[in-house]
Amino acid sequence: LNQDLTEKIAKYHAEFLDKIGSLYYSKENYDDFYFGKGSTYPDVNGSIGILFEQASSRGHIQQSQNGVLTFPFTIKNQLTTTLSTLKAASLLRKELLTYMNDFYFNNFNLNNKSKFNGIRFGNEHDKTSSYQLAKILKTHKIDVFETKGKKFKYYVPLKQKKSRLIKAIFDTNTKFEDSLFY
């Protein structure tokens, strides 16, 4: 469903960019499955992450393979996609809200099927790194608890609102449906 909503939103971007004569790339491939990319952060938080990559004018003006690219034109593209995002969000409001609601509701079902209750981490030889990781997790509203263990200092329960983000952070997935990406 995330990919379907991404495609629907992309149609608004295409419509708006067509009106100003901008070249763009949409849907040829979405590599929206690897959580190491910043554009997937909204995806693991119940939203729709869309990556916009604007060619740089390298200052005020640059010759490109598609002609002259100016700084004002790059700004115009960014503003245009901002406006198309607002229109898409407004017109797809109910679908987006339903998606977000279902995303968090389904977290409970996913958590009940998990083989693990939580994740323990820590390094007795590098307590600072463990502390900093716990601090970062907390900034993302992830529950982290200190433990009395000798090897592991922290515990992150999976049964919480941000369980998909937790799994994205700690999982070491190396198998993908499509292995052709960057």
Where do the PLM segments sit?
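Intrinsic-disorder/low-complexity accessory segments
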Residues: 2-24, 28-30, 34, 40-182
